[in-house]
Amino acid sequence: MTDLVITSPANQRLKDLLTLRRRRVREDTGQSLVEGLEETSLALEAGVLPQTLFHCPELMLDVPAGAALVERARAAGAEIVELGRTAFEKVAYREGPDGILAKVPSPGRSLAEVDLPEGALVLLCEGVEKPGNLGAMLRTADAAGVSLIIAADPVTDWGNPNVIRSSKGTVFSVPVAAASTDQAWDWLAAKGVPVVATTPETDVVHTDADLTGTVAVAVGSEKYGLTELALARSTHRVRIPMVGRANSLNVATSAAIVVYEAVRQRRAD
C-alpha cells in the first residue's frame, strides 16, 4: 500500500493536527503529538503505538535512524504519512526539526489504574506550572527508577509538547497520573503510603528522614510551594539545607535532590 503524501501546508489534516497544541483538544481527543527521533523512539520502546507517524525524507537526510523508525512504526500498525518540507515545518513545534512527528495516545492514566510495587518511590508534584520543570522531573524519575509521578492540581498536562520535549520522551517510560490534591492524598493514604513534604518550614533535613520503603516525595509550585492542604495531609516534612543567599531552589532541582537521597538510602540498606 502506497503511503499518503502531503505537500501543501494548507492541507486539512495538517490543520487538524495543529489543534493538538491546545490542551482542551488533547483532553477531548485523548491524543497528543510527539516530535523528534529520540522522543518517538522512546515512546515506541515503551509500547506506545502511534496512530499516525508523519515523516519528511528531506529533513531526515542527516538522521539515518529515522528511516528505521518509520519502518518500525509501520510494522507496529501505524499509518505512515510522508510530508514535504514546507508541510512538515508547518506542523513542527520545534526549530530545526529532524523530520519525525507522531500522533499518539496522550500519556497518563487514572490513579485507579495504578498498581504500586513493594518499596515504590513516588514523586508527587502539586501545582507545578512550567512544562520544562515537569519534563526535568520526568528525566530524574526515569534515571532514579521512580515508580510513579502524580501531578496534583496540575497547571499543564502530560501531553503538553514542551513537557514531552523537555522530558526527552521519558513521559512515556515513567508511569504518570494526574489528580486533584485531595484525590492524590486520598489515594496514597488508602495505599498506606507516607508522604514526605518538602518545605523550608521545618528543622528536619532531608538526609535525616527515612526515605526507605514505599514513600512519596512531595514538591509544590514554583512560586508558592506546597499548599497548606498538602502540608497538613503529609506524614513528614523535610527541608533541603541552604547556606547561600537564595531562599529557594528550582522545583525540579529540589525534587532531584530528595529523590536521589531516597535512592542513596535504599542502596545503603
How should each PLM-predicted stretch be described?
Residues 1-93:
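N-terminal positively charged helical leader segments and presequences
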Residues 6, 32, 126-127, 152-153, ...:
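Glycine- and other small-residue-rich loops at beta-strand/loop junctions that grip anionic moieties
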Residues 23-24, 115-123, 233-243:
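Glycine/charged-rich beta-loop-alpha catalytic/anionic-binding loops adjacent to active sites
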Residues 38, 45, 72, 81-86, ...:
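RNA substrate-binding interface of SAM-dependent RNA methyltransferases
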Residues 49, 76-78, 97-98, 118-120, ...:
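Short coil/turn connectors at secondary-structure junctions
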Residues 102, 140-144, 155-170, 228-269:
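Structured adenosyl-cofactor binding patch, chiefly the S-adenosyl-L-methionine
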Residues 196-245, 250:
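Active-site/ligand-binding-proximal alpha/beta "capping" segment
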